[in-house]
Swiss-Prot record:
GO MF entries: rRNA (cytosine-N4-)-methyltransferase activity
EC code: 2.1.1.199
Protein name: Ribosomal RNA small subunit methyltransferase H
Keywords: Cytoplasm, Methyltransferase, rRNA processing, S-adenosyl-L-methionine, Transferase
Catalytic activities: cytidine(1402) in 16S rRNA + S-adenosyl-L-methionine = N(4)-methylcytidine(1402) in 16S rRNA + S-adenosyl-L-homocysteine + H(+)
Database matches in InterPro entries: RsmH, SAM-dep_MeTrfase_MraW_recog, SAM-dependent_MTases_sf
Top enzyme category: transferase
GO cellular component, one term: cytoplasm
UniProt keyword Kinase present: no
Residue ranges of the TM segments: none
Annotated positions binding S-adenosyl-L-methionine: 32-34, 52, 79, 100, 107
Biological classification of the source: Bacteria, Bacillati, Bacillota, Bacilli, Bacillales
Gene: rsmH
Amino acid sequence: MFHHISVMLNETIDYLNVKENGVYIDCTLGGAGHALYLLNQLNDDGRLIAIDQDQTAIDNAKKVLKEHLHKVTFVHSNFRELTQILKDLNIEKVDGIYYDLGVSSPQLDIPERGFSYHHDATLDMRMDQTQELTAYEIVNNWSYEALVKIFYRYGEEKFSKQIARRIEAHREQQPITTTLELVDIIKEGIPAKARRKGGHPAKRVFQALRIAVNDELSAFEDSIEQAIELVKVDGRISVITFHSLEDRLCKQVFQEYEKGPEVPRGLPVIPEAYTPKLKRINRKPITATEEDLDDNNRARSAKLRVAEILK
């Protein structure tokens, strides 16, 4: 069963100022909670383009959204293909785009997918089951230096070197094939005192592997840059992030487009080319309410940022 509790559901969609006949893009369909809430506000002239790289999510969403299928176009693709997706649908601009980043609960809860450090499964972690690169490939075949780099950069793991050394030693004996096998090796690389602090000891390495397998950060950066060009004037973009790397990236991109290019000195009137592309609706990210946290513990790290397109 594909059960998923959407985080900050109302806020994400309400900040889009939904027009009942508008065209919107859900870049991360997942359990379809946000999609359902949005579709309930669209009339029969409105349209939602629902993207997910996980075919299982799309198959499930068709059941969840069964009353609204005439208003939805499902696209099995990576959201970094936004421009091409709209081109294929003969759509030039849309009224709003939203992202709910991170792994959906079902992907974490289905052991076979290999995302969870609580269940034993093969080392997979692919959001798109048709792609070739898996966590098994990275753990067993990438160099010590490459492992250190991704654990540190994507997981902010301070014991990256020690963990990579333990992985190297184990895989010389035999391949590391399962999630719990990897968890035990990670624990060996972290001093006992540090293991007792900061949540599950494997959390940061598993996050790093997931980001590397799915190329998440560069895919998001590619996508958000395209989104800014694809939303109409006065349209909005909502982004929910779940870790500091994504949040920082989102904040930096929004800031860059809000600032606009450097204006040459002495101009009597500022040409439109030098005016900002967007404005941030919230300077500080919106965080989950107590109610959200009661429903879903994963909401604790969620942050929502919203921008409005100005030109």
